[in-house]
Amino acid sequence: MQTSKENQTEREVIDIKSLMIDTLRKMGCDPKEIEGGAVAVAYQGENFCMKFGGMFVNIWDLGWCDINVNDLNLPRLRQAINLANFEFGPTIVLADPDENGIMDIHSRYGILFHPSLPNLTEYMAITFNWFFRAKNNLHINYNRLLVEDEKQQTNQNPNDTNPCNN
């Protein structure tokens, strides 16, 4: 038998999920309920998955990039992910490798979502845009680390030149 507190939490989840679906529709999105009570939605060409818990929503941008465990760039990518995760916003997650040695890259962001928040459509647009910013920060950090590594290699062996630069 459920207690009144459990019933209240269940109602909050349903109400918050309904509010989120309505908000996403107002933004021109077409949200879909999927298994496990989650909601899938596309925004500006990116696919997001939302899971609800009380007044909180965990938003995932799943599998937007991948890398093989044997890729020589993996250490640099890990370092770039760590640097990007110091920024405010979504956390970038490097998943465990699958049976083929492929590691997916995801982003996750936990937000408060409640009817008392002003302008929920703008709030969600800003929230989604943080995902794009996190990806951009990852690319910026990766490219900066790549340049630093190339400078370090050039300084170690000045006679070793890149044949593509001739």
Predicted regions: what they are:
Residues C49-I67:
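A short acidic-to-branched-hydrophobic micro-motif
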Residues G63-R108:
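Short, internal acidic amphipathic alpha-helical interface segments
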Residues A38-V39, V57, M103-I105:
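Hydrophobic residues embedded in beta-strands of well-ordered beta-sheets
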Residues F113-N129:
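A short acidic/glycine-rich loop-to-helix N-cap element
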